[in-house]
């Protein structure tokens, strides 16, 4: 069962300690590496499927190109190179989101129990669109693989995939190579029309690539507007790995949430998936979010998440 654990300036430290105790408990069953999905291949097949697929299961198979040479370079993209490879957090999150019964409140919206709070439940807004509830997803720091964009474009009306300008060329190539995997919706793209498809379905997804370096946001790009979305979800998967990047990432998230609320009268929330590496990185992330920026941060507690090397947080204003 999924539970939300609200964190504050006191409980965050207990949470970090307990989460790493849990991580140690599962150490023998978890990969002891940096988290690159495939560290020995430039081209890889990424399958998003349940553990036991059936004929009715939605499954996806993507062929992704990555650059291990760029990852290891000290000169490429001003030494900002992690986006050139696929990290394991994205496939893990997608498989959990799509197939775990406990993730249904994220997919479709629903009440989730809240621990240690006067409020017994919190209503999560649906991450997946429905005819009466158009949804927009803004992915920050997507990386060149574009796996989340292709898979989630099947379920939302608008998907805005963003990263640094240098990442957009390989990202565009991977999206084009896998656009056929968006099978549940017709894709339309104003800025990259070659991504557009013609499916026999009235459901549509606007898929746009946007250059956005969250270390240097002078103004929020107009391309991030919500159009007619009832809700905007900001998605950040496995981008918390360096203490230097934590303040600009969280500042960008807060700025976007506030921009949607104040400039567009649209509620926005965020999901941040953290790969658990150094304990002090997670603590710094939570301290900056909760203490410095006064964001509301909930740890998403669920059996499969708990037994993984990842921690998922729900963040609101």
Curated annotation (Swiss-Prot):
InterPro entries in UniProt: Methyltransf_16, SAM-dependent_MTases_sf
Gene3D superfamilies the record matches: Vaccinia Virus protein VP39
Keywords in alphabetical order: Methyltransferase, S-adenosyl-L-methionine, Transferase
Entry keyword annotation includes Transmembrane helix: no
GO molecular function, one term: S-adenosylmethionine-dependent methyltransferase activity
Protein's UniProt keywords contain tRNA-binding: no
Enzyme Commission number(s): 2.1.1.-
One GO cellular component, as annotated: protein-containing complex
Enzyme class name: transferase
Residues that, per the record, bind S-adenosyl-L-methionine: 87, 141-143, 163, 214, 237
GO biological process, one term: methylation
Described function: S-adenosyl-L-methionine-dependent protein-lysine N-methyltransferase that methylates 60S ribosomal protein L1.
Protein family membership: Belongs to the class I-like SAM-binding methyltransferase superfamily. RKM5 family.
Protein name, per record: Ribosomal lysine N-methyltransferase 5
Species for this entry: Eremothecium gossypii (strain ATCC 10895 / CBS 109.51 / FGSC 9923 / NRRL Y-1056) (Yeast)
């Amino acid at each position: 069962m999924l539970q939300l654990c609200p964190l504050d300036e006191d409980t965050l430290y207990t949470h970090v300690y307990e989460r790493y105790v849990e991580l140690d408990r599962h150490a023998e069953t978890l990969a002891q590496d940096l988290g690159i999905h495939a560290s020995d291949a430039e081209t890889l097949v990424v399958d998003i499927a349940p553990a036991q697929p059936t004929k009715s299961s939605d499954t996806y198979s993507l062929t992704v190109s990555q650059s291990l040479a760029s990852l290891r370079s000290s000169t490429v993209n001003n030494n900002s190179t992690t986006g050139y490879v696929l990290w394991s957090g994205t496939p893990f999150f997608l498989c959990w989101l799509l197939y775990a019964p406990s993730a249904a409140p994220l997919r479709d919206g629903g009440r989730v129990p809240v621990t240690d709070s006067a409020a017994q439940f919190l209503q999560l807004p649906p991450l997946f669109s429905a005819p009466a509830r158009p949804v927009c997803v803004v992915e920050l720091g997507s990386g060149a693989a574009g796996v989340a964009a292709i898979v989630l474009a099947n379920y939302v009306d608008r998907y805005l995939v963003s990263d640094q300008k240098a990442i957009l060329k390989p990202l565009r190539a991977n999206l084009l190579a896998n656009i056929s995997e968006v099978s549940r919706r017709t894709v339309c793209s104003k800025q990259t029309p070659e991504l557009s498809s013609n499916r026999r379905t009235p459901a549509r997804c606007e898929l746009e690539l946007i250059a956005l370096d969250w270390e240097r946001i002078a103004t929020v790009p107009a391309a991030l507007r919500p159009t007619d979305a009832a809700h905007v979800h900001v998605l950040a998967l496995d981008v918390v790995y360096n203490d230097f990047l934590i303040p600009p990432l969280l500042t960008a998230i807060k700025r976007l949430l506030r921009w949607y609320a104040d400039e567009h009268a649209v509620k926005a929330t965020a999901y941040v998936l953290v790969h658990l590496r150094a304990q002090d990185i997670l603590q710094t992330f939570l301290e900056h979010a909760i203490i410095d920026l006064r964001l509301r941060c909930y740890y998403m507690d669920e059996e499969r998440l708990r037994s993984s090397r990842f921690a998922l947080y729900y963040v609101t204003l």
